A protein has these predicted regions:
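A structural signal for well-ordered alpha-helices, especially hydrophobic packing surfaces
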Residues: 56, 63, 82, 89, ...
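Helix-loop segments that flank and shape redox-cofactor active sites
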Residues: 32-40, 55-80, 143-159
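Acidic/histidine-rich alpha-helical segments that form the ligand environment
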Residues: 62, 94, 108-166
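Acidic, low-complexity proline/glycine-rich segments
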Residues: 2-31
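Disorder-to-helix initiation segments
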Residues: 26-48, 126
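Conserved alpha-helical segments that form or flank metal/cofactor-binding pockets of metalloenzymes
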Residues: 60, 66-109, 178
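Short, contiguous alpha-helical
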Residues: 87, 161-193
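Long, contiguous binding/interaction regions
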Residues: 2-5, 9, 71, 103, ...
Length: 194
């Protein structure tokens, strides 16, 4: 009796030869938008997707590592925001695909593409966690507003709507909740009245 390894006994289908569309290419889709417009939108969507994935991971990290008097409230809030960021990721990735592009998906690609700095591996204080989240949201919001304006100018109303109605509004609401949690103090160290 000859024993074969599982990897030898199955017809493996993955590998470079089986890639049907390279990242960075734009497949033709008949939606009334030219390739250049779709390519520009895909780039902005993938950047927002990478930053949203990093923000999602920050929320889960802080959900697991939060401590202190507000543990319970923040533990739940961070998990709620995490879930809402996951919904945004799905919408962003599907829009990339609908425009004929390839969405970022692998963690190493996301870490490389994201403009949001990687956090330390260790546990941070609550003010540091919230400050880090606020900075990440601000990064997403600044870039999203630019991308929404460009999509609008290019006639890509679907991408503009996704940025404005979903990504910007969700991130602004998250910022509101985080800031209200720190109503007695400023997470960025600014003095009141300054």
């Amino acid at each position: 009796m000859v024993l074969t390894r599982i990897s030898e006994s199955r017809n493996r289908q993955h590998g470079k030869d089986n890639v049907i569309q390279e990242f960075g290419t734009v497949y033709p889709v008949p939606i009334g938008l030219g390739e250049n417009v779709r390519s520009t939108s895909i780039g902005a969507l993938n950047q927002t997707l990478a930053d949203t994935m990093m923000l999602r991971d920050l929320y889960k990290k802080h959900h697991w590592q939060v401590s202190g008097a507000t543990f319970y409230q923040l533990h739940l809030l961070f998990d709620k925001h995490y879930a809402e960021q996951v919904e945004l990721m799905d919408a962003l990735a599907e829009r990339v695909t609908a425009l004929g592009g390839v969405p970022l998906a692998a963690p190493h690609d996301v870490a490389e593409a994201s403009a949001i700095p990687r956090p330390p591996k260790g546990r941070e204080s609550v003010p540091a966690q919230i400050s880090r989240l606020l900075d990440a949201h601000e990064q997403v919001l600044i870039e999203c507003r630019k991308a929404a304006k460009e999509a609008s100018q290019n006639g890509d109303d679907g991408t503009n709507d996704l940025f404005v109605s979903d990504v910007i509004r969700t991130n602004e609401m998250h910022v509101f909740f985080l800031c209200e949690h720190l109503a007695d103090g400023d997470p960025h160290g600014h003095q009141k009245g300054a």
